[in-house]
Amino acid sequence: MGEIIQFDVLGLPAPQGSKSAFVVAGRAVIVDGSSKTGRDKHALWRSQVSDAANAARGKTQFAGPVGVSVVFYLPLPASDPHRTLHATRPDADKALRSVLDSLTTSGLVRDDSQVYEVKATKLYARDGHWTGASIQVWDASEDELRYRAESKAASRAKR
């Protein structure tokens, strides 16, 4: 495994809302499905992630394939303080999309299409743990080289 950048983001994880498309007077219109409050929370969260990534990355910018692991820590509901696994909203994929876009905004990765491996986990922030996310991004160039070598070896073995 190549270089690893790891950082924590304190705040309230906010998902990236879905967009809706429809036609008005023959023209396509795309709108954000989130409320203004949702958009404000999302903008704040993305800013917090981008700022934390900038502080952690120094001058690093990953140019090749990367792996990303995110553990989201969400508020513990008063109705069930014994839960650990967070199996309610926000959706993990939408929360993850927000983080990946922020990694691009920060310059840590050039484009979120570079992410070839991803893991997202949602947990409740228990026992005084802060809300936010622990994020790890790693250079996967060595994985690329290993897969190519394994592929060549498998091709030779078939001959």
Spans of features found by a protein language model:
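Acidic, proline/glycine-enriched N-terminal capping motif
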Residues: 1-159
